[in-house]
Amino acid sequence: MPPPRTGRGLLWLGLVLSSVCVALGSETQANSTTDALNVLLIIVDDLRPSLGCYGDKLVRSPNIDQLASHSLLFQNAFAQQAVCAPSRVSFLTGRRPDTTRLYDFNSYWRVHAGNFSTIPQYFKENGYVTMSVGKVFHPGISSNHTDDSPYSWSFPPYHPSSEKYENTKTCRGPDGELHANLLCPVDVLDVPEGTLPDKQSTEQAIQLLEKMKTSASPFFLAVGYHKPHIPFRYPKEFQKLYPLENITLAPDPEVPDGLPPVAYNPWMDIRQREDVQALNISVPYGPIPVDFQRKIRQSYFASVSYLDTQVGRLLSALDDLQLANSTIIAFTSDHGWALGEHGEWAKYSNFDVATHVPLIFYVPGRTASLPEAGEKLFPYLDPFDSASQLMEPGRQSMDLVELVSLFPTLAGLAGLQVPPRCPVPSFHVELCREGKNLLKHFRFRDLEEDPYLPGNPRELIAYSQYPRPSDIPQWNSDKPSLKDIKIMGYSIRTIDYRYTVWVGFNPDEFLANFSDIHAGELYFVDSDPLQDHNMYNDSQGGDLFQLLMP
């Protein structure tokens, strides 16, 4: 039984539902189409592809795997910057960080760079009721303290009331006292309000789906989940899925000899947690004691399984409301998270573990046949059920794709006009896209054909970047403010290699100097899939790299 709602939650829901009624009237006038597809966009925080559907044999994610079994799954999707606010603003506007000019958390793109349209704004302008639940935009300055309202949303976004406790002392330690720890399995009945943010977000999203079921207008619902973002604050029973004796270390837990210091992420954010501080770990390289490394990995995987239950409840409700046959579902993450690879933890780098993300699209009638009357595509699956079978993805693409392609792809799948490609420069253009339209991947001749889509992946490139304040790791290397950025690491990922150059950067002019090379990295994927052996030769310079930039 769900915990009783707070007065604040009931007030918000009442305001929202009354706003929906008002929005329905105005949006129906804008779009009288009754058969337009709805959109459910699920955005997860810090989720690398540690999922059964991506081949992870340890992680229990039956509900996300079930979604993938009816979907098109992209095996090689990459974020454009491995930190929350810049990545979210990038893919929600369809522009790269060098266009949004957001590399930190401290500016609002509409004021700082250009009045760029967003995905929900575009759907709203095309007759959709647009709704935000949980962490969609990063809260704060980077979304104008409003989650980009009123531009993007038909009414004010919802944030769970228990969100405010995420970084407070709610983790009960072995001493019986409460701490602000990294590892924070909890008894849900023992935490403030008797609930957790992602549980509240699921409940509110389901209530909105119930309201929209009878709507004459299509809806665009974005649901942002917090876990597995730190702190790892999740119901403690999920630890049982991952006994410590079954948890291995990262396959490459040492800092590679050839790694340039500028490329290293010193994981300062997790060092601030009380349980990590107690370990007295040296800065910047550590390492973290082996037994604690296992505990971090255990809690990350447990957080993923907890997240999976919330996704499962949301999709099961979509099914129960008979909306699965009229709703596109897109599932992704803002970036990945290192779990000890290269001696690193968290995001904040250009490595695959930080930039590689899940990207899954369910399109009714395209990626899967329409469900028969009474058929459930997404029945809730319990991750504690050991009898559950691993489900293979319905369709897969090995092509390299970027999160910046989410905007044109969702627009095209919904039958809206795909925004045009951006000119260079595009700061004056409100509606355009810098990502590719991925619609070609959804043109299936026969759902029974080879589930691996053909193509020439060597023609494709994914771009990422990360700023640094210094050539050597320091206290603000992970999250430098714009004024402190001295170096930008531009990274190209192809099917064959990852190539990164770290070049001088002028934060006042937002200008990279490719003749001022500080360091470089080159990893060949076939022979070095973990990216541990840097083959970069300083004589290669930045000329070739600059030619390959978008």
UniProtKB/Swiss-Prot annotation:
* Keyword Calcium listed: yes
Consequence of changing L41P: In MPS2; mild form; increase in enzyme activity observed in transfected cells
Per its record, the protein catalyses: Hydrolysis of the 2-sulfate groups of the L-iduronate 2-sulfate units of dermatan sulfate, heparan sulfate and heparin
Annotated phenotype, changing R468W: In MPS2; mild to severe forms
Q: Tell me what happens on changing K347Q.
A: In MPS2; severe form
BP terms from Gene Ontology: dermatan sulfate proteoglycan catabolic process; glycosaminoglycan catabolic process; heparan sulfate proteoglycan catabolic process
> Which residues belong to the signal peptide in this entry?
1-25
Reported impact of P86L:
In MPS2; intermediate to severe forms
Outcome reported for the amino acid change (mutating R88L) = In MPS2; severe form
**Mind telling me which residues form the propeptide?**
26-33
Outcome recorded upon mutating G134R: In MPS2; severe form
Tell me what effect the entry lists for L196S.
Answer: In MPS2; mild/intermediate form
**Outcome following mutation: H229Y:** In MPS2; severe form
Q: What is the effect of changing L403R?
A: In MPS2; intermediate form
Q: Short name of one Pfam family for this protein?
A: Sulfatase
Q: Name the consequence of C422R.
A: In MPS2; severe form
What binding partners and quaternary form does the record give? Monomer. The 58-kDa mature form is composed of two chains resulting from proteolitic processing, the 42-kDa chain and the 14-kDa chain that remain stably associated and form the 58-kDa intermediate form which is enzymatically active.
Function, in words: Lysosomal enzyme involved in the degradation pathway of dermatan sulfate and heparan sulfate.
**What is this protein's record name?**
Iduronate 2-sulfatase
Give the organism, scientific name. Answer: Homo sapiens (Human)
**Gene designation per UniProt:** IDS
